[in-house]
Amino acid sequence: MSSAYQPLTPALTEVNEAGHLASRQYGDVYNSPADAYGQAVDVFLHGNDLPQRWRGRRHFTVCETGFGLGTNFLALWRAWREDPGRCGRLHMLSIEGHPLTREAYEAVLDTQVPEPLRAGARELLAQWPKLLPGLHRLEFEHGAVTLTLALGDIGQVAPRLSACVDAFFLDGFAPSKNPAMWDTYVLRRLLRLGAADATLATWTSAGFVRRGLQEAGFDIQRLTGARGKRHITVGRRSAWAGKHAPRRTDAPDAPVLVVGAGLAGAGMAQALALRGLSVRVIAESAQPHGGHLAAALTPLVARDDNARARLARAGSQRAWHRWQGLDAVRKVGALQLERDAGRSAALADTLAALHFPRDWVRWVESDEAEQLAGLPVARGGLYFADGLLVRPQPLIDALLAWPGIERVRGRVSRLVQCSAGQWQALDALGQVLGEARQVVLANAAGTPLVLEASGLLGPLPRVAQMHALAGEVSHVPAAALGGGPHCMIGGEGYVLPAVDGWCVVGSTYAPGVAQSEVSLAGQQRNLEKAAGLLGAPLDAVAGPLPGWAGWRAVMPGRLPVLGELPGVSGVWLASAYGSRGLSWSALAGDVIAARLCGEPLPLETDLLASVGPR
């Protein structure tokens, strides 16, 4: 396992003799015994000149250390709701090393969360994430208020965050109880995110903390405290440090062009439209997944928790939150099986080493696997309770129906930069299909073709390796599979629950072919894969079967390409999703939309680097 991987350990709590929730890990209380709500307002809001500083702003970003019970977030949210002059959008980025489980938070909400904040806490509880390491984006007020929870050790998390922060709430357990959180190096790595005029506030006035904040580039003052605090500390970014600060970005006022209307383009367009942007989607085909009955969205695990596993985990979580309530998406669960007993044992060992929560993934023996599937299966494996069965084209149609999205039929052949930084998207005849300052190429294997014709591919050797890979699935009558499995069964191939009386079985990989089409040879390979998962041949299936064939855009390493072209302002890529278009769709859309709109990014910087265009 990678030495960088650290399992996420939930909070261990108890209620002390005074009735306050305390951490057994650190021996300190979560909330101020005097007045937790009042301290949140006096120290963190007023200490950062809030709400005055967000007035007249399109968006405002806060970064917090020590989420705990969410008291500071809830107080900030309440102040925003009550302020008629509030900013358009409010973002909080909060780091928590030992989060409470959903059950633990629910158990203490009515006794430990201050009464004025409990209504907000119940909304927070409804979105409480699975306790998985990484970033979790929660949205409130129809997306106008976002909370990005960064779960993990602050020493690992802080260097991987990307944001332009207006105010810091430095909370958490006392420096004497949890010195690692107040380490000078950690503070420096965190406070680098501050804008040129960023402020900070904290309830502690410990000398080494104040010195660390000064070393991190802040002018520090110790002020008289209140509500049980003798002194508090506030600060403003020093002029010398502000020269190196990240620059604020406001959302584009003009429309954004998205080239491609498949899973990549639809996810991108929806993410932009949700933020109030106008989007023009240009695509040749109105039904790129027509006839594709169903597909599976499942995470994956790797013993070293590598970039692909982390991205798949983040993508599946993002999709689940973004697509809830859509008719095209159904949570059915997913079994992941290996091809033999030896590989199964290795998979079980991997799961044990990673310490993921059982409500996200757990090991099941063959008997339980059969109960979950409702069919005989070859062996036990991993069970992901949140596995999603998706009808791809209805999902795409639902995403592209979002207000603010305009669809245009046409095939973009090249991009041309014209005056004032505008990009024109031209077809093969030179006709202008759209014009914008920001263009996202989300057209799968067509991406390198457009870049090459535009003179932009040369500096991108990785993108130049992108190619199309054919594949097909077979549609098996559900009656031939006892009505079909109750959950998705995957491994080397997959068998999906019935949709409209058919079970999708797949899939093939056919490199080097000129045409992707349904074939008897492909059907045979798919049925063989299904037999390997179910432990027996599909004898009830006879004759040619219907199916669906398409193309995957893939690159070496099986990772997508995501981000702005280096040195080329306004051209973005969201492509090479391969077999995991459902995994990357919502996440990639949010990453690029967040970058365009100046939000904290919902993905760690090392993962962004792994999928960058260069």
Curated annotation (Swiss-Prot):
- Family the UniProt entry places it in: In the N-terminal section; belongs to the methyltransferase superfamily. tRNA (mnm(5)s(2)U34)-methyltransferase family.
Q: Under what name is this protein listed? A: tRNA 5-methylaminomethyl-2-thiouridine biosynthesis bifunctional protein MnmC
Q: What is its main location?
A: cytoplasm
Q: Which Pfam families match?
A: DAO, Methyltransf_30
Q: Which cofactor does it need?
A: FAD
Q: Identify the species of origin.
A: Bordetella avium (strain 197N)
HAMAP family linked to this entry: MnmC
Supply the NCBIfam families for this chain.
MnmC_Cterm (TIGR03197), tRNA_MNMC2 (NF033855)
InterPro entries recorded: FAD-dep_OxRdtase, FAD/NAD-bd_sf, MnmC-like_methylTransf, SAM-dependent_MTases_sf, tRNA_MAMT_biosynth_bifunc_MnmC, tRNA_MNMC2, tRNA_S-uridine_synth_MnmC_C
The family database entries (PANTHER family) matched by this protein are listed as: SARCOSINE DEHYDROGENASE-RELATED, TRNA 5-METHYLAMINOMETHYL-2-THIOURIDINE BIOSYNTHESIS BIFUNCTIONAL PROTEIN MNMC
Q: Name one GO molecular function term.
A: flavin adenine dinucleotide binding
Alphabetic keyword roster: Cytoplasm, FAD, Flavoprotein, Methyltransferase, Multifunctional enzyme, Oxidoreductase, S-adenosyl-L-methionine, Transferase, tRNA processing
The record's Gene3D superfamilies line, in alphabetical order, gives: D-Amino Acid Oxidase, subunit A, domain 2 (3.30.9.10), FAD/NAD(P)-binding domain (3.50.50.60), Vaccinia Virus protein VP39 (3.40.50.150)
Q: Could you state one GO biological process linked to this protein?
A: tRNA wobble base modification
Where in the cell does this protein reside? Cytoplasm
Which region ranges are annotated with the description tRNA (mnm(5)s(2)U34)-methyltransferase? 1-238
Keyword Flavoprotein tagged: yes
Query: GO cellular component annotations, sorted alphabetically?
Result: cytoplasm
EC number(s)? 2.1.1.61, 1.5.-.-
> Would you say which domain of life the source belongs to?
Bacteria
Q: Which reaction does it catalyse?
A: 5-aminomethyl-2-thiouridine(34) in tRNA + S-adenosyl-L-methionine = 5-methylaminomethyl-2-thiouridine(34) in tRNA + S-adenosyl-L-homocysteine + H(+)
